[in-house]
Amino acid sequence: MKRVGSVVAWSVVWAAACAVLSAQNWPSFRGPGASGVADGAPTPVKWNAATGENVLWKTPVPGVAVSSPIVWGDRVFVSTAVSSDPAAGIRTGLYGDVEPAKDVSKHAWKLVALDRRTGKVLWERVAHEGIPKTKRHPKSSQASATPVTDGRRVIVSFGSEGLYAYDVDGKPLWTRDLGVLNAGWFYDPDYEWGIGSSPIIWKNLVIVQCDIQKGSFLAAFDVASGAPVWRTAREEIPSWSTPAIYEGDGHAELITQATTFTRGYDPGTGKELWRLSGNSEITIPTPVIGPGLIIVTNGYFRVQPIFAIKPGATGDITLKGDQTQNQSIAWSTPRGGPYIPTPIIYGDQLYVLGINGVLAAYNVRSGERVYQARVGNGGSFSASPVAADGKIYVASEDGDIFVFKAGPAYELLATNAMGQVVMATPAISNGVIIVRGLKDVFAIGMKP
């Protein structure tokens, strides 16, 4: 590492903080604290993208992007990559191909700001133009990382094309070259899939997780100036997970998951605190911070684990033999973890959605499975669930958004067709659901 510059009580504080913050802003991938929760205002059950029922606005955003929208105040921010090839697109569904997309044309990488109330484009900025330095997965894009904001600055990562900072009015502030980030099939570096991990902000730091074929690292930059603060080397193969921050009991932990280890770090210094092995070969979901627990999941070959980790661990906390818990792990299961969607904790349940639409709900404290159900009729899911107003929203790649009631049994309330592919995780702000489709950004809310 290189230096450059009681559960109940916590549950109440955590739930209250998430509710208050998420009612105002959705500043990063999966919103405040990466929770995916935005209570505090009523949200719609049904809408109709074709007729406009409960659709407040719809704004086209050119390009191919699977990054998610973020919201701060009266602005929505989205990133995109506009290819000069009119045939550029993504391939949805379930398949096992490892070949990257053949789109190697000139691109323009952009950050776009929309008015949250009207959908009007307030500004757009071209961060970079050129031929991509690495290829991308057919299901992904050259703009896969979700921006992050602290309300003054918006930070967006375009991977090998750089890390960029703007103020909320679109003024360029700084940029950082992260190097060529070749993330792809670990068995053959020629199969490039692109990066997917989004930057996060903690206090005065922007933190990025860059797990690549060679030279993986975790790095922090000053959010105001872009100056490097610390950089920690990682012995990891490519992963696509966004890090998360646990804060409680007077300390903070930066949680990263990857194939070799899930790790906890001191976010202020980059020093490793603990590590846990036992993950699948590909790791994508973001760690989820719950009531006195850190939930880590992944769901590729050969295992699909769910770990409920107690904060404050030190050293190697890997389970031994047939163990399912130890001093640092409250509970675990070797099966049931999701491949792409990040789970969500809502109330006292952990909801885990598989890429094939199989949904399982667990008691978050005990790990007991409450129910299992199938969402939809066999479609594929890349977007992560989000929740508000006692409801959970799940978007399929085909563009159907399923709304079901949170609770001890699966109860589907509505299915809403967006009319286009949806890969990005929705944002929720003040009762309005911001849905990023492959062509348009929608604001869904209850009309007077």
Predicted regions mapped to residue ranges:
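Bacterial N-terminal signal peptides
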Residues: 7-20
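Noncatalytic, solvent-exposed loop/strand surfaces
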Residues: 22-448
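N-terminal hydrophobic targeting signals that begin at the initiator methionine
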Residues: 1-2
